[in-house]
Amino acid sequence: MSLPKPEASCMLLDRTASAAHRLSMGSTNKLKIGIFGCNLNSGKNATLVPERWSGSWDDNLRLAQMSDDAGLEFFLPLGRWRGWGGATHYQESTFETITWAAALLAATKRITIFGTVHTPIFNPVVAAKTMVTADHAGHGRFGLNLVVGNKDEEFAMFGVSLLEHDERYVHGQEWLDIVRRCWTDPDNFDFDGKYFKLRDCLSKPKPWGGTQPLILNAGTSEVGQDFGVRNCDAFFTAVRASSFDEKTGMVVPDVASVKAIVDSLRARAAAAGREIGVYTNVNVICRPTQKEAIEYYRYVLEENADWAAVDAQLQQSGIPYADTPEYWAHRRRAIRQFPFIGSAEYVAELFATMSKAGFDGIGMTIVNYLDELPFLCSDVLPRLEKMGLRD
């Protein structure tokens, strides 16, 4: 009796795990495009609308396969252990990201899928093994998004106290050194550091293909950027420098300021003798016309905003609630994030602007990823191809 062959959608096709393939995510596209924040309920949009993102496993699986088939390069999850409350219990239901990545990697063909790992709450030897498991499931398509800090409230759940800012990177360096030794050292090893003292460590198998997963970091401080330059293949940096017209919903990136951010990161890496990729995220609301897009934006993020969840985020950032114009400006900036709102033509132009500023890739947050990604793939991606940004 012969067993049936696996479905094509779950077969791994024509991709190696060479270092070059890992760094390029197996793609020759000048501008890489991926999905950001789909592993939790509501994604990155604090909205009450009924069509908001469920974050369910079935929807994540469908989205991963849809993104893979469309040629998107990456899936990047948020590391979240508790949410922000509000009427929607915003971001309270979330999948742990390494196991999430492993399962999705086994069901996709080409896309790189990251796990977001908080170094203070993951034992590095255990983390090294679980990440290798995910990497084998995807034949070399796992990536590590490394985070050395987070909210005090989340760490308290694990009985862990947040270290002083710069000290987090000392701890993070030891953590990553141990992980890399687990990934590369053929022999047993000891480790005697400030935060970790380990004896006779051994970890097999090694990552798929004898190379190491792509490592991403989002440090913004001087010490954080130095850490990233030493250790990581790419930076993920948020963009705030832009003007936003409240009436038209049109965002105008401050290209000079954005380019300065990218150039600074690349210069820091070059001074250390390294090259790095630079990525960012945007919140996309794309419709056939600008009018439809701005109307949907107002419906989702103004008329139906989960303001209690937004307030919780602001307060955690040190901005207490106040019924003032200044506070409302903070609210609006927080909920819309860095928005790409408009027609397919306009959104494609915004992607091109970010590429010209030096970004290698962009992660998209979307109100409902499954409902809206097909239009982006059919109407925005072909425009980027004509611009020479994608094949």
Where are these regions (language model features)?
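Active-site-adjacent structural elements that line small-molecule/cofactor binding pockets in enzymes
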Residues: S2-D391
